[in-house]
Amino acid sequence: HAVATANCTTALHLALLAAGVGPGDEVVVSPHSFIASANAILHDGASPVFVDIRADTLNMDEQAVESAVTPCTKAILAIHQIGRPAELTTLAETARRHHLTLIEDAACAIGSEYRGRPIGCNDWSPLVCFSFHPRKVLSTGDGGMITTNDAQLARRLRLLRQHGMSVNDLERHKARTIVTEEYPILGYNYRLTDVQASIGLGQLRRLDALLARRRAIAARYDAALAGAPGVQLFREPPHCRWNQQTYLVRLPGVTAARRDAFMQALLDAGIASRRGVMSIHREACYIERFGRQSFPESEAASDQCVCLPLYTQMTDVEINQVVAAVRQHAPRA
């Protein structure tokens, strides 16, 4: 089952609701993500319990999740950061052992693979949430989707998505008899529009070509930046295949200020970049709720990582310009 939604934030909200997450519950999640991952938990009335990341994957340390589980834990939210799959085998086993629901935040991960299987196949978890934001590999302008292999979950998701309506518009309009809808539960207006869906279907037919081009650009970056002073590259593990939504490099040992100066030098050379992934626990609204917390690996990665340009229309000349600027301006720790 694939349930389309207005965006991935609404997908996460619905997935958590469908899993029974509510007030007083806890959800184990990485602090190293866009803030929506944790916000969706708060919007359900639950509390995020952060677990630090691994420096090599930028994903939640799967071995540390066990110690974060309490009697209040209801779910584990596994984030495939920038399209790089989390260690689902270990996380699924932890979830099974503690009778928790494993939910995948696959906002960035359409087209990525884990142990030979596509993210979204539901082999490890019953709920996988995708984003079709403009930054993603497949975009509908904005949009989201939840995949599930559970028919009851799919029905609940569709009810929640459309005001709790018992009959969807298509079924009602195709019916040869009068159909009066009912509203057995309180729901939301979280639907994807037909126009966005039509764009998504067109993009889906191009997905293999989009992925191939992104992987080719990433391979050129890998070759050209290998051994560049002051630049650390991330290597794809053999059991994963990244979709290369984002090409991320690390400037080891630098402060956020030096990282920002590097980004400014790129911008002055006509090259846009972005900081790496944020650390949610450092944002004011989370400090106000939970106090100051320390997750050193997430904080260091947030301060030292930079996203370089990568888009399917990128030319080899542009790639070479980025490489030259990175080699010229990369700070030495």
Where are these regions (language model features)?
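Conserved core of the PLP fold type I
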Residues: 1-22, 45
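PLP-dependent aminotransferase class I/II
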Residues: 63, 67, 75-79, 84, ...
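Conserved active-site segment immediately N-terminal to the catalytic lysine
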Residues: 104-138, 155, 179-184
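Short acidic capping loops at alpha-helix termini that bridge into adjacent secondary structure
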Residues: 1, 23-26, 72, 155-156, ...
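Short beta-strand-to-turn element immediately C-terminal to the catalytic PLP-Schiff-base lysine
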Residues: 121, 130-131, 144-149, 201
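Hydrophobic residues at beta-strand termini and immediately following loops
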Residues: 5, 51, 308
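Structural detector of well-ordered beta-strand residues that form the stable sheet scaffold
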Residues: 3, 28, 49, 101-103, ...
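PLP-dependent aminotransferase-like
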Residues: 17-106, 113
